[in-house]
């Protein structure tokens, strides 16, 4: 990891007038982050899968902070939709100051997308990785923030087996692997894209819709000991708005503090292999 430089994105004045893209913006952490950055004066760009919830959050942001944000629908379980989203965003915005790659999910049983990938690694990692690559030029001088989790310690990343075909499926391990991939990708992006401040973060255990339709859903939605979505989004919003000189590009953060990683997650050589494997998987090797 290398120290960040002050030209990366946000000055001390906050997010006023900055373009902030939030994926997974229709519920939970993404929704809370969108509302928070809008209150700081950002031009918010929402991305979500469900059109009704997307309209609801669009209206909530407009009521909170004035003008309605831009909203784009895309299902990250289909890479074709992600590519189309990338084209639309490139056409619309000459610059994106912050990309908060937050879309994610948990799948209780093994699910394969129409692209041929295990759904957890595609929705939580590969789709966001592809979108960041498609927006590479728009992110120059800006920030890339990847939502991760301390569940990364349960991950078993293998660049030669992104689908985890060599092991019996475990929802928890698949989720942890996807979050491990995000930490490693932020670190590798910092090495490959020096003009982008790339970081990942752990939001804490948050009351969200994750795991909907599974036995885990009630735990994540109703457990009184879990954090609120607003609290879970706090580090994301801080990473988007803090002075660049206070942050470390490539770093993994928890509760606004740089948090060390170890083992395979800290292996730069493995991260480079993951980057190349991901690029080949999504069919984009230009960056």
UniProtKB/Swiss-Prot annotation:
Could reduce the 13-carbonyl of daunorubicin to yield (13S)-13-dihydrodaunorubicin. Could also be able to reduce the 13-carbonyl of doxorubicin. It comes from the Bacteria. The active site is at 175 (proton acceptor). Its EC number is 1.1.1.-. The keyword Oxidoreductase applies. NADP(+) binds at residues 24-30. GO terms for molecular function: oxidoreductase activity, acting on the CH-OH group of donors, NAD or NADP as acceptor. Keywords: NAD, NADP, Oxidoreductase. Belongs to the short-chain dehydrogenases/reductases (SDR) family. Substrate binds at residue 149. Pfam families: adh_short (PF00106). This is Putative daunorubicin C-13 ketoreductase DnrU. InterPro entries: NAD(P)-bd_dom_sf, SDR_fam. It comes from Streptomyces peucetius.
